[in-house]
């Protein structure tokens, strides 16, 4: 019996452990909607959209910009800006410690990235929220980076696109955070006065001060499929009005049906459809027409 344990069972267990440890972490991903187990490299090919149920998973700001803009001619705006704990705010934890933890987790200095570049040959400037950074909350640096992107659009007369994913204003910055709602709204008013298109893309989720300001001020407002969009969460609203709310009333499909947004576009169609839309809004040739002209020339 002892020989069998030594010669057969123990080596078998050791081989099994070696196999387990050799599987890279994060190679498989479980869809939060249909619970299908998906192979990570294949999921990346579908832009983090479940091939089984079409669930649009949350992705980071840099990943979103990377799949949206052309590869060449990119330049980040306001990358040097860093948040400062001006109020020495503390709840259960110091704000500066929360910032340090979020920066370590995401590799970003704050919750918004702005970048100039091209969309299928059309010059544009893009901002994208990083939800993993303190819930994509809007503080002074988020507001300033957004304004710098808008100013770039004004100076270069190019369209601006913003991908929102946020829980709202950053409570640790108090009034400074709330001021960003006015600041971003004011610069968008300038874009509108100058006739420069601003497209707002609402991704999952968009709430609070962001939904009450810049996210809903687009000339065209686009939602990703089944994105949660609102001001307060469903539970808070139900407790306030003391009524049961309709199923999915904060989903992008419900908002489209009731006229709160203009379009729902799947992630894999965003590049071509927004490029065509912006070409029409700016009077420039569509990417398809530009290719035809180049081919004839």
UniProtKB/Swiss-Prot annotation:
The gene is accD. This is Acetyl-coenzyme A carboxylase carboxyl transferase subunit beta. Keywords: ATP-binding, Cytoplasm, Fatty acid biosynthesis, Fatty acid metabolism, Lipid biosynthesis, Lipid metabolism, Metal-binding, Nucleotide-binding, Transferase, Zinc, Zinc-finger. Gene3D superfamilies: 2-enoyl-CoA Hydratase, Chain A, domain 1. Its main location: cytoplasm. InterPro entries: AcCoA_carboxyl_beta, Acetyl_CoA_COase_Trfase_b_su, ClpP/crotonase-like_dom_sf, COA_CT_N, Znf-ACC. Coiled coil: none annotated. Pathway: Lipid metabolism; malonyl-CoA biosynthesis; malonyl-CoA from acetyl-CoA: step 1/1. The lineage of its organism: Bacteria, Pseudomonadati, Pseudomonadota, Gammaproteobacteria, Pseudomonadales.
């Amino acid at each position: 019996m002892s020989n069998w344990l030594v010669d057969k069972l123990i080596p078998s267990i050791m081989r099994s452990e070696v196999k387990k440890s050799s599987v890279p972490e994060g190679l498989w991903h479980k869809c939060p909607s249909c619970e299908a187990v998906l192979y990570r490299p294949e999921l990346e090919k579908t832009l983090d959209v479940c091939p089984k149920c079409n669930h649009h998973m949350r992705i980071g700001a840099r990943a979103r910009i990377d799949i949206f803009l052309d590869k060449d001619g990119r330049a980040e705006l306001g990358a040097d800006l860093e948040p400062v704990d001006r109020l020495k705010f503390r709840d259960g934890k110091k704000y500066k410690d929360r910032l340090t933890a979020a920066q370590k987790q995401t590799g970003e200095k704050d919750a918004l990235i702005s970048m100039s570049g091209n969309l299928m040959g059309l010059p544009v400037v893009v901002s994208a929220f990083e939800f993993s950074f303190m819930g994509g909350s809007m503080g002074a640096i988020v507001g300033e980076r957004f304004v710098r992107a808008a100013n770039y659009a004004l100076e270069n007369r190019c369209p601006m696109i913003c991908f929102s994913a946020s829980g709202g204003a950053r409570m640790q910055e108090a009034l400074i955070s709330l001021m960003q709602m006015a600041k971003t709204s004011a610069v968008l008013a300038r874009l509108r006065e100058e006739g420069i298109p601003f497209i707002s893309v609402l991704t999952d989720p968009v709430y609070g001060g962001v939904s009450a300001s810049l996210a809903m001020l687009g000339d065209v407002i686009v939602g990703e499929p089944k994105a949660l969009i609102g001001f307060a969460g469903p539970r808070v609203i139900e407790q306030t009005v003391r009524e049961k709310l309709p199923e999915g009333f904060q989903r992008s499909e419900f908002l489209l049906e009731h006229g709160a947004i203009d379009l729902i576009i799947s992630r894999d169609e965003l590049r071509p459809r927004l490029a065509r839309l912006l070409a029409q809004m700016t009077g420039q040739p569509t990417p398809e027409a530009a290719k035809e002209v180049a081919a004839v020339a």
